[in-house]
């Protein structure tokens, strides 16, 4: 796993225009992490983090700019668990095709970590492909209120800050309100990989991002819960941008606090 971190750190100091390497299947990190400049909207890249653990990376246009978005794929025996859609129907269809091409195992279950379109957009594509889709009751309720796609099944036991439940090869953790009131994080104990979703920002971020549904007061406290619950995490994957280590958590808290302070000053 130290090799994974080394590979990621080397990449973070390299040019973001570098071309990503093909996916490796040996369990080793698969070269440089794909960036927004390398992925046309409608295409998806896979990046192997560890044996049986991949991130999926897509891009989407929003307000005249193009943004990257991460998700997770975890092997569960002869099946795959998908964490988050690829931000839209076209991207999610491309994701399933890429998984079939590069991994060759069926996606049987999918979890959406909060109600925004970058996490649930494409749920209908998954459902049509026979994938059982899951989210917390809060996420399902908020998605319906927003007019977004709604995962079919409810994940129970994640209603209070600090709640954690095992779901196949991963642990789902509700740290409390942050980027949204319903955001979950996902931990892969076999690989010490923490997927922070949109509750966690990449190291290069200087903005709190989309805070329309955020709880700026609680976000740093929720990040602290993640830090305390997963001190052994070696790789941390944000919802958007480059993975890194546990320092992404403190960086996120600092960015959110700075945003809140600026808002108060204004």
Curated annotation (Swiss-Prot):
SMART domains: Lactamase_B. Its EC number is 3.5.2.6. It is found in: Periplasm. GO terms for biological process: response to antibiotic. Zn(2+) 2 binds at residues 118, 198, 240. GO terms for molecular function: hydrolase activity; metal ion binding. Class B beta-lactamase which confers resistance to the beta-lactam antibiotics, including penicillins, cephalosporins and carbapenems. Acts via hydrolysis of the beta-lactam ring. Has penicillin-, cephalosporin- and carbapenem-hydrolyzing activities. Its main location: periplasm. GO terms for cellular component: periplasmic space. SUPFAM superfamilies: Metallo-hydrolase/oxidoreductase. Belongs to the metallo-beta-lactamase superfamily. Class-B beta-lactamase family. It is an enzyme of class 3 (hydrolase). Zn(2+) 1 binds at residues 114, 116, 118, 179. Residues 1-20 form the signal peptide. This is Metallo-beta-lactamase VIM-1. It comes from Pseudomonas aeruginosa (strain ATCC 15692 / DSM 22644 / CIP 104116 / JCM 14847 / LMG 12228 / 1C / PRS 101 / PAO1).
């Amino acid at each position: 796993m130290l090799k994974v971190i080394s590979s990621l750190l080397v990449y973070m100091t390299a040019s973001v225009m570098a071309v990503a390497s093909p996916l490796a299947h040996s369990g080793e990190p698969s070269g440089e992490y794909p960036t927004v400049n390398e992925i046309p909207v409608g295409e998806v890249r896979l990046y192997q983090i560890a044996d049986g653990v991949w991130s999926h990376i897509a891009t989407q246009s929003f307000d005249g700019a193009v943004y990257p978005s991460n998700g997770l794929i975890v092997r569960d025996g002869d099946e795959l668990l998908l964490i988050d859609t690829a931000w839209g129907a076209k991207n999610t269809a491309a994701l399933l095709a890429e998984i079939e091409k590069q991994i060759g195992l069926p996606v049987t279950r999918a979890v959406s970590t909060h109600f925004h379109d970058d996490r649930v957009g494409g749920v209908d594509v998954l459902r049509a492909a026979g994938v059982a889709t899951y989210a917390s009751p809060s996420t399902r309720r908020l998605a319906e209120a927003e007019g977004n796609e709604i995962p079919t099944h409810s994940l129970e036991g994640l209603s209070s800050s600090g709640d954690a439940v095992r779901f196949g090869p991963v642990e789902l953790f509700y740290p409390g309100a942050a980027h949204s009131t319903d955001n979950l994080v996902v931990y892969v104990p076999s690989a010490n990989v923490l997927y922070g979703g949109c509750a966690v920002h990449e190291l290069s971020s200087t903005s709190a991002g989309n805070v329309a549904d955020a709880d700026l007061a609680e976000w740093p406290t929720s990040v602290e819960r993640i830090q305390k619950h997963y001190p052994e995490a070696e790789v941390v994957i944000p919802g958007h941008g480059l993975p890194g280590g546990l320092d992404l958590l403190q960086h996120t808290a600092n960015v959110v606090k700075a945003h809140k302070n600026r808002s108060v000053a204004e």
